[in-house]
Amino acid sequence: MAAKGAKETLVNKLGFKSSSSSSKSAELEVEKLKRENQQMKKSLEDMKRAGRHQHTHPDTDKARLLERILALETLREKNNQQLLGREQEITTLRQQLRSAHGEVVSSLQSQLENKQHEAEQRERQYQALVKETEDLKNKYCAVSERCDTLEKQKGSSGELAVVQEQLRDALEKNQHWLVYDQQREAYVQGVLARIKDLEAQLNEANQALQQQHKEAKSDDQSAQKVQQELEAERNKVSRMQMEVEDLQVRYEEKSREAAQAREQLLEERRREREDRKSSVERDALLQDQHRKREAELIMQVNLLQKSLMNQKEEQKRMAILEQQIQLSAKESENEKLDRQTLQHQLHKVLKELRKARDQITRLESSKQQRESRFSEPSSYNRMDLERLTIQDHMTSPSKVHNILDESVLECPNCGASYPTSQHRELLAHLDYCFT
């Protein structure tokens, strides 16, 4: 009876039933932790995918804006090339105007019409470019506001709230896991201490049994049974030790898995931080690029405005030139009329000169005849000589020259005056002056 009571006390002290139930509960908790780790991994992958989808939308909008800006830059370069070509054409036309004297008015009018058409086209292009720049500015402001709203909504959107809740759950589960690890370590240490206590109790029981064996040699059979029971209990204790070792191995494996999961979480957090930093840097670079492009576009707009002002000034100058050309045309017409009148006057003067020449030749011939007559004194007497002298005085060439000197001829070009007696000098002067 005493042996049976000692056996029951040993069994109660060992607590085999509680150990088996605790091992099952530990396995169930380990499986739950595995499932929770898998769910956390899936949630993190979903977070990554959602973050990538969120980052792609503004990037596509910004890429479209960049393509539009490049297209505008190509148009600007084409317009600059066209302007250079037109300026070259204007220079060639000016040279042609300088070279050609008879076709000045028609060529200038055609050039003015072309320039007016070109100025209208440039104004239309400038207005279109201004509208496009304003549209781009509005789009850029909308994109920047959208990026700001997306950055602000990152903390308030439903998906991010779910992800944050999942992260909080993961952190809480990690804390529970740490508490469970600590509890398991305390449990294992308690089991080991209990095993040590049981071994001490077994030693004490062995010593007590030996003492009882010495005291009661008659109860050999009961002692053998007790020894068998003790051996069975020792086997059970060894089994328990094996189970504890298995639990320790499993605990180490679970702790390794938990450490790996922690490392993965840390790496994912680092990656998310790096992605956020890279996205912020990209946004900053894009904003800087957009600002630079806006500054360039503003400079281009200013240059176009200056060019338009220059064009307007050129138009004013061309209008002044048109007026001057019209005045020159009128003056040329007036000069033509003056030339025609002068030519008519010259024809009249030449006719008069011819008449005067004829008269002079006649007078010279008559003078020669008279001189020849005066050379024969025998045929004339004194009275005849007096008559002839009187007639000579009346019709002398000096008098004729004096009559001719009273009428004056003028050069139509420079206004130089010559008497009619110097008609030959006037003709030489006209040849020199008009050449």
Curated annotation (Swiss-Prot):
One of its GO terms (cellular component) is cleavage furrow. It is found in: Cytoplasm; Cytoplasm, Cytoskeleton, Microtubule organizing center, Centrosome, Centriole; Cytoplasm, Cytoskeleton, Microtubule organizing center, Centrosome; Cleavage furrow. The keyword Coiled coil applies. Keywords: Coiled coil, Cytoplasm, Cytoskeleton, Developmental protein. Disulfide bonds: none annotated. Residues 18-140, 185-373 form a coiled coil. One of its GO terms (biological process) is cerebellum development. Residues 1-63, 213-239, 268-287 are annotated as: Disordered. Pfam families: EABR (PF12180). Residues 26-49, 213-222 have a biased composition (Basic and acidic residues). The keyword Ribosomal protein does not apply. Disruption phenotype: Morpholino knockdown of the protein increases jaw cartilage disorganization, decreases the size of brain structures and the lateral area and convolution of proximal renal tubules at 4 days post-fertilization (dpf). Embryos with CRISPR-induced cep55l null mutations display altered craniofacial patterning and atrophy of the proximal renal tubules. It comes from the Eukaryota. Its main location: cytoplasm. Plays a role in mitotic exit and cytokinesis. Recruits PDCD6IP and TSG101 to midbody during cytokinesis. Required for successful completion of cytokinesis. Not required for microtubule nucleation. Plays a role in the development of the brain and kidney. This is Centrosomal protein of 55 kDa. The gene is cep55.
